A protein has these predicted regions:
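A short local loop/turn or secondary-structure capping micro-motif enriched for an aromatic residue
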Residues: 71-72, 189-190, 227-229
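Conserved small-residue
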Residues: 91, 108-199, 239, 250-251, ...
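Generic beta-strand hydrophobic packing signal
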Residues: 170, 207, 216, 304, ...
Length: 340
């Protein structure tokens, strides 16, 4: 199939933004987006095929699908030089592909008069690639979010991993697994920001189970994600300021307040022997984005539920036909390496 994604109304016009001002008076301010009358709708070409299979009187079901989409004329706001009087300009700047697989499996291992046990499993994986940007217009990278670490679009030939959702930031220098130090303090990479990870997971999935025994029901639902990265500025500030429990490891009970860090002195090429104040070392070590980027993999217990359906004979002399009582909990536990 082929579809066109158009802009929202008035996005190509040089209109004013109306807001509520001081004292209830309305104010009108100029739009900070430079109007582009030549912009075209995005073009999306998609392919998908799959199958739905049932076996053993539908006690085993498999639903699988493969898809691929190609998006051209991507509409992205491009940051302008402030001297232009505008912040951004919407432009058609590239091509991006997505392809992946989605799988659902349903199984009923046990089914008797009084007991039934069912399992359901789902899995999905998507591979994204930024094929091209507007290199002919001097646009080889686009920063979508920039505060500390940066969420950027880059192709593979611009020191990027070539996929949507990539994180870039500053990082400490390691050589042969050894932290590089100068004057006893960690050395931070100078120059272009390095690749930290991608916010999108490698794959996601879920597992659910249901038990039914006579009038009782019990169900559990798990969700899981493998891969992906998450950036936490809270972690950086908490470690630098000593407000996180992990920062206790840096404190000296004797009050000496000095540390000889494990690493290589860049000036001598030998093991570091320079002692520096702990406070200075901690602030230098945690003043980079790499240290606050974590693997976003997780396993979640999304829901537990237990229920009981009252026997119909108990309702015989009432206007009620069915009554069920349930207790459930949602988002009960999460297992992950991301710090709280």
């Amino acid at each position: 199939s082929m579809v066109r994604r158009d802009l929202e109304p008035y996005q190509t016009a040089s209109n004013f933004i109306i807001s509520q001002g001081w004292g209830g008076n309305s104010t009108a301010t100029a739009n900070n987006n430079y109007p582009n009358p030549d912009i075209k709708p995005e073009k999306v070409v998609s392919y998908e095929f799959g199958g739905d299979f049932r076996f053993f009187n539908s006690r085993v079901g498999i639903d699988v699908a493969y898809y691929k989409s190609i998006t051209t004329d991507l509409i992205i706001p491009i940051t302008l030089n402030p001297s232009a009087g505008y912040d951004t300009k919407l432009m058609n700047v590239g091509k991006m592909t997505n392809q992946g697989i989605e799988l659902m499996v349903n199984v009923v291992p046990v089914r008797t008069k009084d007991l039934e046990w069912s399992l359901n499993f789902n899995f999905s994986k998507n591979k994204n690639k930024v094929v091209a940007l507007a290199e002919d217009k001097g646009i080889s990278r686009i920063r979508q979010i920039e505060r500390w670490a940066s969420l950027e679009l880059r192709t593979e030939n611009t020191k990027g991993d070539g996929s949507y959702g990539s994180l870039y930031g500053d990082y400490l220098v390691y050589k042969d697994g050894q932290l590089q130090l100068k004057n006893g303090l960690p050395v931070e990479e100078n120059g272009d920001w390095g690749y930290l990870g991608n916010v999108n997971p490698d794959w996601t999935g879920g597992l659910g189970t249901d038990f039914k025994y006579k009038n009782w029901t019990f169900s559990a639902l798990f969700g899981f994600q493998h891969g992906g990265s998450v950036y936490s500025r809270t972690y950086i500030e908490g470690m630098r300021n000593g407000s996180l429990k992990e920062s206790l490891a840096w404190r000296d009970a004797d009050g000496a307040g000095m540390i000889v860090a494990d690493g290589i002195d860049v000036e001598t090429g030998q093991k570091n022997t320079v002692a520096v104040p702990v406070r200075n070392y901690v602030q230098a070590y945690y003043d980079n984005d790499m240290i606050a980027t974590f693997d976003a993999s997780y396993v979640k217990l999304r829901e537990l539920k237990i229920g009981y359906t009252l026997p119909k004979k108990w309702l015989k002399n009432t206007p009620l036909k069915n009554v069920s009582v349930s207790a459930f909990g949602r988002n009960l536990f999460i297992w992950t390496d991301v710090p709280n």
